[in-house]
UniProtKB/Swiss-Prot annotation:
Enzyme class, UniProt record, top EC level: ligase
Stated name of the protein: UDP-N-acetylmuramate--L-alanine ligase
One biological process term in Gene Ontology: cell division
Annotated binding of ATP, by residue: 112-118
Cellular component terms (Gene Ontology): cytoplasm
Enzyme Commission identifier(s): 6.3.2.8
InterPro entries with a match to the protein in the record: Mur-like_cat_sf, Mur_ligase_C, Mur_ligase_C_dom_sf, Mur_ligase_cen, Mur_ligase_N, MurCDEF_pg_biosynth, UDP-N-AcMur_Ala_ligase_MurC
Record keywords, A-Z: ATP-binding, Cell cycle, Cell division, Cell shape, Cell wall biogenesis/degradation, Cytoplasm, Ligase, Nucleotide-binding, Peptidoglycan synthesis
GO molecular function, one term: ATP binding
Pathway: Cell wall biogenesis; peptidoglycan biosynthesis
Catalytic activity: UDP-N-acetyl-alpha-D-muramate + L-alanine + ATP = UDP-N-acetyl-alpha-D-muramoyl-L-alanine + ADP + phosphate + H(+)
UniProt family annotation: Belongs to the MurCDEF family.
Length: 468
């Protein structure tokens, strides 16, 4: 590619999936420019790295580019896309560019409805600890690296594979992880779960004959597709029949301790004692996927243990903001603030269970911003059930993400349904900008407040910290 194209322009460069690819290409020696509608910490960091970043979309931004990269979030009538097409500049989908990067190395792709970002981060961290120096492109900020991408000198590249638009079918990895399969982004699959499962089967079939499919044995939908996967399979999970299996799992505050039993066909490998610096059974499963990959690639057990014990997490994945003061008007004391990206009922339930495991004697308060009207509609009853499992709930209006409002699928409807269910009395905060103060008005000494959602609620924890 490089002998023909020197300058690549990214439309929507501030997105989590776009910025990482741009950074790796910059480090490979390409001239990279990009544009985004809004300035952010991500765009500022990319500019500091040496990219030419424009805020706002304009035809002039693509001048001199040999190709432009877009994501599915970029509309076809974007002025930069139109200018590129008029000038016969190739318009490359993000996933196609990611596939091009993977072609340069041996790819490890992590797919699944939930847990992709954390699992990808764990795989990258364990391989790095094992001296394999991987390249990685992740959908979240890996705390230890201070970035969501890095160009390594080793032969492997670890990437997050996005099923939301079926673009993961562009990738050609040599190892593929499937964490779970759940009904989300169903517009892509015609609201047909069978089509969704078929896409994951096709994803595994894109492995070479010598490749490896690392599949979660605990997920019913993943188990259903296993008979149709024709590549070598390694299973992982809490299920006793998994080849990489966690036993004697115990929560120790926000850490998990467990023993890993591993079978490589008929060979039983030595048991591995693990202390994971993440809470929750869902993160035990994520760690098992990383252990399965590391074991197959010959990473030393000591390096695996070290990486998992020292793992510093990923941005907005059970990120702890520490203990903050409760206003004196509410009795004083402190509360613990946690920030999480979860926005699907399955993810929310796993995070709340992790919080209860970490702080079993404390009140768990959930501050939640629903993400997309279609998801709220499709998962309405599941949202009511999960929200009702918290001890206190603050609920905002839906973050639309470009969607038009839907009748009976907004924040007020969720709040009413939750009130009727009778398990918890919700506080509805229509404007997410008022949520930080609402949290401080609600909390009491000893509470654990989990701020959750994939939209503008991401700004809330910092604002709570400023007000507290």
């Amino acid at each position: 590619m490089k002998h023909r194209i020197q300058h690549i322009h990214f439309v929507g460069v501030g997105g989590s999936g776009m910025s990482g690819i741009a950074e790796v290409l910059l480090n490979l020696g390409y001239t990279i420019s990009g544009s985004d509608l809004n300035e952010s910490a991500v765009t500022r960091r990319l500019a500091e790295l040496g990219m030419r970043i424009a805020i706002g979309h304009d035809r002039a931004n693509v001048a001199g580019a040999g190709a432009i990269v877009t994501s599915t979030a970029v509309a076809g009538d974007n002025p930069e896309v139109l200018a590129a097409r008029a000038a016969r500049i190739p318009v490359v989908p993000r996933a196609v560019m990611l596939a091009e990067l993977m072609r340069l190395k041996r790819g490890i792709a992590v797919a699944g409805t939930h847990g992709k970002t954390t699992t990808t981060s764990l795989v990258a961290s364990v391989l790095a600890a094992g001296g394999l120096d991987p390249t990685f492109v992740i959908g979240g900020r890996l705390t230890s690296a201070g970035a969501n991408a890095r160009l390594g000198q080793g032969e492997y590249i670890v990437v997050e594979a996005d099923e939301s638009d079926a673009s993961f079918l562009n990738l050609l990895p040599v190892m593929a992880i499937v964490t779970n399969i759940d009904a989300d982004h169903m517009d892509t699959y015609g609201h047909d779960v069978a089509r969704l499962k078929s896409a994951f089967i096709e994803f595994t079939q894109r492995l070479p004959f010598y490749g490896s499919a690392i599949l979660c044995a605990d997920d019913a939908n993943v188990r259903e597709i296993m008979p149709f996967v024709s590549r070598p399979i390694t299973t992982y999970g809490l299920s006793p029949d998994a080849q990489v299996c966690a036993q004697d799992v115990q929560a120790d505050g926000t850490r998990m301790r467990f023993t890993v039993q591993r079978r490589d066909r008929d060979v039983v490998l030595p048991a591995l004692q693990v202390e994971l610096n993440l809470p929750g059974l869902h993160n035990v499963r994520n760690a098992l996927a990383a252990i399965a990959v590391a074991t197959e690639l010959g990473v030393d057990d000591a390096a695996i243990r070290e990486a998992l014990a020292a793992f510093k997490g990923v941005g907005r994945r059970f990120t702890q903001w520490g203990d903050l003061p409760v206003p004196a008007a509410h009795g004083g004391g402190t509360f613990t603030l946690v920030d999480d990206y979860g926005h699907h009922p399955v993810e929310m339930a796993a995070t709340l269970a992790a919080a209860r495991g970490a702080w079993p004697q404390r009140r768990i308060v959930l501050a939640f911003q629903p993400h997309r009207y279609t998801r709220t509609r499709d998962c309405f009853e599941d949202f009511v059930r999960v929200l009702g499992s918290a001890d206190g709930v603050l609920l905002t209006e839906v973050y639309a993400a470009g969607e038009a409002p839907l009748v009976a699928a907004d924040g007020r409807a969720l709040s009413r349904a939750l009130r009727v269910a009778g398990k918890v009395e919700p506080v509805f905060v229509e404007d997410v900008g008022e949520l930080p103060q609402a949290i401080l008005d609600f909390v009491r000494d000893g509470d654990v407040v989990v701020v959750m959602g994939a939209g503008s609620i991401s700004k809330t924890p910092a604002l709570v910290g400023e007000l507290a």
